[in-house]
Curated annotation (Swiss-Prot):
One of its GO terms (molecular function) is UDP-N-acetylglucosamine 1-carboxyvinyltransferase activity. This is UDP-N-acetylglucosamine 1-carboxyvinyltransferase. GO terms for biological process: cell division; cell wall organization; peptidoglycan biosynthetic process; regulation of cell shape; UDP-N-acetylgalactosamine biosynthetic process. It is found in: Cytoplasm. It comes from Protochlamydia amoebophila (strain UWE25). Pathway: Cell wall biogenesis; peptidoglycan biosynthesis. The keyword Cell division applies. The active site is at residue 119. InterPro entries: Enolpyruvate_Tfrase_dom, Enolpyruvate_Tfrase_sf, MurA_subfamily, RNA3'P_cycl/enolpyr_Trfase_a/b, UDP_GlcNAc_COvinyl_MurA. Cell wall formation. Adds enolpyruvyl to UDP-N-acetylglucosamine. UDP-N-acetyl-alpha-D-glucosamine binds at residues 94, 313, 335. Its EC number is 2.5.1.7. The gene is murA.
Amino acid sequence: MDVLKITGGIPLKGQVKAAGAKNAMTKLLVASLLSDKKCTFYNVPNIGDVEVTVSLCQEIGMEVRWDRAAGIMEVITKELKTSYIPQRFSGSNRIPILMIGALLGRTDQDIIVPTAGGCPIGQRPVDFHIQALEQLGAVIEYRGMKREGAYFAHAHNGLKGTLITLPYPSVGATENTILAGITARGVTVIKNAAIEPEIVELILFLQKLGAIITIDVDRTIRIQGTRRFYEVEHTVIPDRIEAASWGMAAISSKGKVFVEGAQHLNMITFLNKLREVGGGFDVRSNGIEFFYDGPLQGGLHLETDVHPGFMTDWQQPFVVLLTQSSGTSVVHETVYENRFGYTDTLKEMGADITPFRQCLGGKSCRFASQSFSHSAIIKGATPLVGKEIRIPDLRAGFAYIMAALIANDTSTISGLPFIQRGYENFIGKLADLGANVSLVEEEKNVKEMPENSSKLPLFAELQVN
């Protein structure tokens, strides 16, 4: 498998464009399965998770035309070929479980969905999904199969709207409940719902599709069921995770990068924390410029939370930033229980990070009585040294890229498909920003990145009709 070599110490400088949001586009594809109308998407990210989701949707009957260069995709699902999701998708991402909510109103057949996958960052149970769907009238059973297992679901008596209070504002459970509520009879009310920008994006798309749906400031979503749908054109919001990632990479490398498409509204909490450590940024009409504005100051307490709190996917690269900040900082992860495994590699590179099982620096969270390392103390600033790194998951992957960019000497990074799941053309963008990067193929030939690498492919082309 190919590996990436990065020689650190070069400030990133230039401009990149934030691609369409992974966590929006993948869910919009699933939502389009609710109807038999054509949906046209713009600003579609050319990333691995969209590839997998397209392949999954095609498996059950979606027709797809994807102009990757233009970022335009047309989809239509005139009829379902099957309601069985093959087990090869079980470890791909978290999308398969959302098929239950989307397909319950589209078929009378059993919907068979393999065990959920995604990044190995915690247990990420789907109990909240199942409980909410059952309240709407779905019958769901888990059965062991040859390799893993699958959920069997149906709504032979139809779905009926009701009041659902989620135990925790889970993004996935909120999405699944919304999708099922669209075709349920009557009104569905979801309390304690997630209100992430990607949830709002889903709601905007569904309203265009024909839904009558509202969202209130108290985390309440109301849906009037319908089966009357329309053709839709929709532009996907820029990815706030990618935008923040490039911003942190710019500042930690003592550089200056303008991120086209970065949206101020969806990054308020992140920008506040960035300013607290001394990171510079300039909000413009078409994006945000991030720049090194002098030595970074730690002494920060950071707690991840559901929106509008500090996003859990910003946590790993921000920890790398804190390793370059003077003083002692505390990070408390409250969304996923097992998201500090990546720090072992950072410590081997020279970082001073100590994970703890206790809730440090703030409120107690739902992991307080469990034996998970979900807090960390980071002491900086510490120099980092290059090493061989194996990427374990998507967001830790970018944290390792950041660490390699600021490390002394050269790092060799494997597991690149994890980053390709969520970052469009990240190697080309690194090269365009001046990073010293080279891709080493299996036969050990080295490909130096040309000056203008913005068109370099990330992965093998998926055949999409």
